[in-house]
């Protein structure tokens, strides 16, 4: 057949040549493939018909070729198994053992031009198809094509809905034997894969491989742009696309481009609207029956996955896995910059962006940039105004499901995260982490401009604006500008007079939820925050922080006009109005203007006649709390005189 390489024009010329030179040529009707023997041709055709005449008596598995059955039988015999000296794992074929050994050596001799390397030539061949777009394996049922034959085999089960592998313990079925094997480990708690470095054990073989990277701190592939380093060149190649804006993976359906291939794969699901598994309760549809099974638990309230440590139950196994970390308190992933430790490597990766200040994800609508794609997705909802997550208890709607979950705790009163130091409880683990810094005094977030440190990152972000003097958020009503959108929102309430936060105890209303929280302490008389310097106690921690400045005599906020210094930035802002003569807060009743909203609020009481501050001793009411305080001295004097007379 060597002389046939001259016939490159096509199949017809090759066929003509073979017919004249060979008397026994057998051809495949489906593809351009030729055979010298009828037996070989018949064997090959069996693949296309789907017939599997050769059956294993031991397990019932069928094959299209006798050779494949003979190879399969060795699984049951296991006489000539080849064992790995490194981990003890046994293999039927020596070639499989050779491939497996590369897991331990880390050898990846098959390299492609994009920088990615592989330990098997078959993996390289499959990877090449990503770049070429070649998908040789096509589903006859729906026409979907795949890079790998194994993907096609798995895909076919969607049409047949066949799940032949069943868990004997729970009855759950799977379409792959490997998935069943992995699932079984969940029940028996077996962790056969151990890290030689630290002794940590894992239930899945691939997990210790990922875990080992923690110990090997070698990151030889460095980004020239931001000096970020990676262990693999392929990861660096992907990272560089953030700076270049390159998006080589394009969706054929809508034209949308992506920088990562896996993101394109996830995106494609949007276009394939096949959702055959529908919930009878609410009508929601899913592509997979397992997703429907999980969804149904919302209606039934079933929570089959129980935590052995605290007894808490969950509807999804993955949530139980995440929950278990609370009890271990293990945080193996540490930030080299600030020393903060994390339970997951993905969380550490997200955290690192704080130090680099890199914001690669930009909103096309308003130009605002973010350090996480998830934050950008959440931000986009601002422009659409969509709030799909609604509270069944009070009807309030939210942009995020996580915000709804946290909101629900208001109705239940649940605060599962408790501080061991002072007993204070929180509804979020992140709030507990932040709270703990009060006791430790840890301030990991430092301002590069002035060196001031903060315990919360958001406080650092707010602080940075002091150095820039930028005020992008302007009030349309009075023209006043602010450096934060949240302050503008609060300011707007001056014009509207809106006070949505009401005290259930006395009926007093507030513009801010934080003001209501502070006010509530009046009724409880609880003052858990004590000053170590003078012993004075406070109901709010922020008030203690402000108070501490008195002892240090530090006044970091200086007026450029007259040189006067202040403890607080807000006091400086209030003071500045003296020089400008600005009076933005106007009374709608009489037209009188004030330089501060608090003065306007006090003034309004003249028109309403409202006297909210009442003396408990004699019942006399006052417009201002300061007037009530002065009045109380009268009773103290009377009480003293009565005591002396007695």
Swiss-Prot record:
The keyword Electron transport does not apply. May be involved in transcriptional regulation. One of its GO terms (molecular function) is zinc ion binding. GO terms for cellular component: nucleus. It comes from Homo sapiens (Human). It is found in: Nucleus. Keywords: DNA-binding, Metal-binding, Nucleus, Repeat, Transcription, Transcription regulation, Zinc, Zinc-finger. The keyword Cell membrane does not apply. This is Zinc finger protein 493. InterPro entries: Znf_C2H2_sf, Znf_C2H2_type. Coiled coil: none annotated. The gene is ZNF493.
